[in-house]
């Protein structure tokens, strides 16, 4: 059965058809040029997924921003008094909190027969409003535990995950969330494709792009996780095809999922993806979402990763 993707109008396109269209966009300068992100000029920004205790060190090494967890940063279950103090703590740090991940906790069900979008929408809306107040640009929507389609559907009498219906439920959630936060101006939710052994829906950048195109909201974009792309053998052409939808990236080394530069022999695998980012004029963030090591090695590894990324 071909890999499928949600597309405008509720139809499906298989992976081969999408790759052909992506290759066409890449090959025609007039098309690829009109698909570049809205931001112009500048350069790619580099950050790391770490907590606030590490931000001072990251700043001294030369990183541009940091990325934290939504629950830790904004905790939508806590009151406004807590949030005001938290917002001040974030603002006092020497680097901007540009992105956050871990958007929807696994306690919420977004797909399957027991999906209940109401509580998850309330949680997500409050998180996004706090994220905008804090100056966050992108909130990463991976959340495999919440989005993975459970196996308790029945298809033609056979129990199993109804992936197509699950993707529609996920897209419906994105659509309603974007409607609720249409008044926001800067923060965007970015759909994170996860490799197949972590999620049974939205495994490729081109699939996330189809949902974005259908929802058609300025509050929704795409994330390209270069580690997941390498593991899923997804071509860098998907980055070019995503073009204007691409708002954030993650990266980790190929074999061990450690910091960039931890495996000198595999660094060359990053180059096609960075060439694609440069081809579309990408000036968003690239966060190291990876293992770092401990103790004295940690600072050295932060430096190694940043040097590696700047050379690409």
Where are these regions (language model features)?
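Active-site acidic/histidine proton-transfer and metal-coordination neighborhood
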Residues: 23, 28, 109-221, 300, ...
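Active-site loop signature of alpha/beta-hydrolase-fold enzymes
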Residues: 105, 196, 229
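Structural motif corresponding to the early beta-alpha repeats
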Residues: 64, 68-171, 257-260, 270, ...
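Histidine-acidic metal/acid-base catalytic patches
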Residues: 6, 16-24, 28, 36-46, ...
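N-terminal secretory signal peptides
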Residues: 1-13
